[in-house]
Amino acid sequence: MSGSDTAPFLSQADDTDDGPAPGTPGLPGSMGNPKSEDPAVPDQEGLQRITGLSSGHSALIVAVLCYINLLNYMDRFTVAGVLPDIEQFFDIGDGSSGLIQTVFISSYMVLAPVFGYLGDRYNRKYLMCGGIAFWSLVTLGSSFIPRERFWLLLLTRGLVGVGEASYSTIAPTLIADLFVADQRSRMLSVFYFAIPVGSGLGYIAGSKVKDVAGDWHWALRVTPGLGVLAVVLLFLVVQEPPRGAVERHSDSPPLNPTSWWADLRALARNPSFILSSLGFTAVAFVTGSLALWAPAFLLRSRVVLGETPPCLPGDSCSSSDSLIFGLITCLTGVLGVGLGVEISRRLRRTNPRADPLVCAAGLLGSAPFLFLALACARGSIVATYIFIFIGETLLSMNWAIVADILLYVVIPTRRSTAEAFQIVLSHLLGDAGSPYLIGSISDRLRRDWPPSFLSEFRALQFSLMLCAFVGALGGAAFLGTAIFIESDRRQAQLHVQGLLPETGPTDDRIVVPQRGRSTRVPVSSVLI
């Protein structure tokens, strides 16, 4: 018989068939008891058979991916750790300083869809190796730029986006193809621990290397060497697992990639993906603003309080605030990601909408604490640090949960594309423009006041208050996600199991009896 002769006589219904009810056995992690001990969810032995990798090897792959994720964020925030020195070296203001991060994020955002498309269709391991090698080379080159070539620093920071785009769109999909259910959530939480820890290490390494070397340029020469090690580990340790195999039944048809436009149309019709991406955009806006401007704001606060001397031309700027903020970022990130995943995991037992609700609570809860941190900065730097700690902990609850939402509402053959467009959306409306926007508002306010250290502090203080408002908007987007999350997850599960096949726009349909009722199916599915 030909391949067409062995196809099922009748195919499962799509839009006219409601399919199995939520919680139906045979759908992994189906709603009603998400991530339950479903018999269709493969056990450890089943995972090893499907992926061809032992549990130890899979865990080692995640460890390598975590190391690279940590390295990416460490490099990104090394610049923020020495920002006052960069401003002094190139003789630039707050607006131009904000461009450093904006140019990088813009490049990252433009390249993400390219690597998302490639990641759904080609070998993900080699894509990451090439991107990280290029990123390491460009980062090293950016440390040798003379003071009269600020535009060249912007160019090199933009090119760094190649490496980050090649990695960030692909790495989570590898984890999704190695683990399922609670195991996947735990591995994603470990993976996303690297974001706050890497960010904090960037502040710490940047400030301490500058102090030891006596030159901020050396801060940019640490991560390229670590990047070479990352490429070696990727090449030797990481293996490509089959896409989506751990989520299919043994008798389910294989998932084949659809056209790029079909992928985009499907994602645009997925409200959980769109709304959770908008909520994550608010997280990116706030974290991007704080990442670049919090150390500078804390330094200005301490200058106004008389606790530290101002940063004058020819002098090295104080790095203590970068060090403290880096430690806070590490601690709050680990605490927030862990709390978010654990709270969500426990609430899922009784509430299938737990994931977006926990994200909403984190964002809505962080907004007042960030506002209080800014409002108290002129009176007590200790109170400011306490409120920043609480606000960043609540904000960090989102990282792993948002990634998990994307992976279970989007089918495997579209996940890299979905990751890419979530990156584009979150950066386009989030941290691509927020550092520059905050810096520009600060510069505009300073022009209306007499020049002084107090006016510099107040201008940045008022501009950063925008973050609290944006955080509240993000919380509202996650509340909207909670409305659609059950139906969108169930649709993705049906599709992976082959119960909701794709049909072309010209594929005529007929009504045939199935399971005692009329069901609309493609004509091709009843032809022998």
Curated annotation (Swiss-Prot):
Gene Ontology CC terms: lysosomal membrane; membrane
Location of the protein in the cell: Lysosome membrane
Principal location listed in the UniProt entry: membrane
Keywords, in A-Z order: Lipid transport, Lysosome, Membrane, Phosphoprotein, Transmembrane, Transmembrane helix, Transport
Family annotation (SUPFAM superfamilies): MFS general substrate transporter (SSF103473)
Catalytic activity entry: a 1-acyl-sn-glycero-3-phosphocholine(out) + H(+)(out) = a 1-acyl-sn-glycero-3-phosphocholine(in) + H(+)(in); 1-hexadecanoyl-sn-glycero-3-phosphocholine(out) + H(+)(out) = 1-hexadecanoyl-sn-glycero-3-phosphocholine(in) + H(+)(in); 1-(9Z-octadecenoyl)-sn-glycero-3-phosphocholine(out) + H(+)(out) = 1-(9Z-octadecenoyl)-sn-glycero-3-phosphocholine(in) + H(+)(in); 1-(5Z,8Z,11Z,14Z-eicosatetraenoyl)-sn-glycero-3-phosphocholine(out) + H(+)(out) = 1-(5Z,8Z,11Z,14Z-eicosatetraenoyl)-sn-glycero-3-phosphocholine(in) + H(+)(in)
GO MF annotation, one: transmembrane transporter activity
Lineage top rank: taxon: Eukaryota
InterPro entries per record: MFS, MFS_dom, MFS_spinster-like, MFS_trans_sf
Membrane topology recorded in Swiss-Prot or TrEMBL: Multi-pass membrane protein
Quaternary structure, from the entry: Interacts with BCL2 and BCL2L1.
Entry's family note: Belongs to the major facilitator superfamily. Spinster (TC 2.A.1.49) family.
Official protein name in the record: Protein spinster homolog 1
Source species: Bos taurus
Lineage, uppermost ranks: Eukaryota, Metazoa, Chordata, Craniata, Vertebrata
